[in-house]
Amino acid sequence: MKYAASGLLSVALNSLLLLGSNQRFATQDVAPVWRGIAFGQSTDVNFATNVLPEKVGVNDVTINGKKLTVNDKADLSAPITIESRGGKIANTHDGLTFFYTQLPANVNFTLQSDVTVEQFGPESDAKPNAQEGAGLLVRDILGVPRQEPLKEGYEEFPAASNMVMNAIMTQDKKSKTEVKMQLISRNGVTQPWGNTNAEITRTSYQEKINLEQTPTFRLKLERTNDGFITAYAPKGSDQWVSKTVKGADLVTHQDKDHYYVGFFASRNAKITISNASLTTSPANTKPSAPFKAETTAPLLQVASSSLSTSDTYPVQARVNYNGTVEVFQNGKSLGKPQRVRAGDDFSLTTRLTQQKSDFKLVYIPSEGEDKTAKETSFSVEKITLADARNLYVSPEGKAGNDGSKNAPLDIKTAINALPGGGTLWLMDGDYSATVIPVSATQRKGMKTLMPVGKKAVFHGLQLNASYWKVKGIEITEKSFRIEGSHNQIERLLAHHCDNTGIQVSSSDNVGRPLWASHNLILNSESHSNQHPSKKDADGFAVKMRVGEGNVIRGAFSHDNVDDGFDLFNKIEDGPNGAVMIENSISLNNTSNGFKLGGEGQPVAHQVKNSIAIGNHMDGFSDNFNPGALQVSNNIALDNVRFNFIFRPSPYYGYEKQGIFKNNVSLRTQPGKYDDAVVGRLDASNYFIRIIERSTVRVRKSRRRITNPSRCQRSSAGMKKAACNWVIFCRRSNRHKTQRHRNRYPSTPA
């Protein structure tokens, strides 16, 4: 074909312009436009966890000293600096700062550059926690740009996508200067806010990169017809180390016509991109097999003890799918298979006719994808003890003793030997980290663990069993974790643990029917817990796969390095069961007082008659839970950021959100933020609006408020005198000072 002179000139000029830049395009006449954006959870300008005060809100793309807005256009001709002091790389969603361009679905690409890691991990003395990262990224959709300036009381919700990352990640959470390269891919996302059953894979392919010695290296991300390639090479070298993942159409699920590729940083990282180039070519994408979410495998949990002091023995088990269970004793069937429902306790009573008996359980699921038989075997030994229903235990106890006060058992033997309705008496002393295995005895009453003296201290305790009462013990160094159900925890003190003090959670492989449910934590205290990352060490937590009916009542959480009470919920798990917190206090924790959810999952938690004082972030927070929360008769005093923050749902109107009654917000000194509450409110609530910016009349009557003294403790850890916070707040409630109802305009009174 012949071209007119003007056409030839145009082609020549365009070619020169393209050759003069670092971008080459085989399928497009016009070079893509590059832009900067920050989006997703924890990218808002108020996010401050492990962030230096002067860096709060920094999630910026900078070129030649200019910070890009979402409307600015750029290219790859100059170095690009990306700094993120918020966001996270989560299993089902991301919060990050992204320098990107949009490409059509019918092209492949190769993106590569030199990357200099200016800083990685928190700039404070905290350690990395594997939610920070930086590198190259391709994803099928963008999140909504974060609000700038931020509307008070609003924070960014999760932004989910299918994606592939060539990611710089912490090597081991111990060092800020040693990182590794990972290929991270996510598939199965069908909604922009995330969904259950999405899948993430993380594959390390270059380990132990020392940033002090080699802060600059080369990275590459490539889309081919059948997948993606991530690669790393030393600076100035073509000695690439690479990793491949199948599925080139992974990034065209939510948007069939386009995808987005570029450079990112998340949580706590700063990188500079230089010598960047993007090359595209026509794609002949090979269709992938439809994504199929991995289902929970059938699980048979033996809930019977390995020791028995009686000839009568209950064979017990739990399963996570409906089915049948058949029991064999010493090779002989004890009857035809019995039906069992997922989550229910299976029990069959037999007699032990010899000193040692062998059992086999055969479980055949009647639902789910895998209906093949599952077998498990165990043995039971008969033993003789002084009084099986009252077993004494000592740190120096021995398995061969009779369990009397003068001949105490060791803790492991006593746990296995204790029958339903019995009590395990703990002598004073320090007990090493202990596991109470799965058990389900209930017909003869609950089992009890309690001290006979004044100070029984466990250096970690894992309660996998159900129907236990745990009273009056102390936990330190390692957490008290509860994975069983129908347990009662009373008058327990947890302190100086390296993670959350007292936590109800479930393993990720058991399935919803076996999630921890109907546990009661009563009149307990948790304080001074601290994880090495300076995060994640809550006082109390009921989070990460919990069922219905868990209750915290009369708890005191203070001076923990994260939240006082944490009900966090991951998208990939689906909504947790509703939790009730009542008559509890959260004081001086480094994050929130009461964190009532997470990641946009709607759950109708309840918090009643509780107090949040001096927490370093928010007093009462929905933490992105848009569900029908019930928040009543609570007091928030002098929390650093918001006393109350309950955000507008991005999914539906206020009428489906929380119910708020008789809540009171107080400050002894002016705060920075108004309370921000969206939901169903009435005139019984008193929330703060800063007077200088308010046109609403404030009550004229005033009364001076004096903070009470801190609780004092003896060397034994017990309170010398009762705390007077509750009395203080009750008095303050009678003299509501500089308070009034505050609501979003769309929320009715």
UniProtKB/Swiss-Prot annotation:
A Gene Ontology term for the protein's cellular component: extracellular region
GO molecular function: metal ion binding; pectate disaccharide-lyase activity
Activity regulation comment: Activity on pectate is nearly completely inhibited by ethyleneglycol-bis-(P-aminoethyl ether) N,N'-tetraacetic acid (EGTA), EDTA or nitrilotriacetic acid. Activity is specifically restored by the addition of Ca(2+).
Annotated signal peptide: 1-26
Superkingdom of this protein's organism: Bacteria
SS bond list: none
Classification via SUPFAM superfamilies: Pectin lyase-like
Subcellular localization(s) per the UniProt record: Secreted
Binding site for Ca(2+): 538, 562-563, 566
pH dependence statement: Optimum pH is 7.5-8.0.
Knockout-associated phenotype: Mutant exhibits reduced growth on pectate, but retains pathogenicity on chrysanthemum.
Keywords tagged on the record: Calcium, Lyase, Metal-binding, Secreted, Signal
Reaction equations catalysed: [(1->4)-alpha-D-galacturonosyl](n) = 4-(4-deoxy-alpha-D-galact-4-enuronosyl)-D-galacturonate + [(1->4)-alpha-D-galacturonosyl](n-2)
Cofactor: Ca(2+)
Database matches in PANTHER family: PECTATE LYASE (EUROFUNG) (PTHR40088), PECTATE LYASE PEL9 (PTHR40088:SF1)
UniProt record similarity statement: Belongs to the polysaccharide lyase 9 family.
Function: Exo-cleaving lyase that catalyzes the digestion of pectate. Contributes to pectate catabolism but not to bacterial virulence. In vitro can also use citrus pectin and highly methyl-esterified Link pectin as substrates.
The protein, known as: Pectate disaccharide-lyase
Organism: Dickeya chrysanthemi (Pectobacterium chrysanthemi)
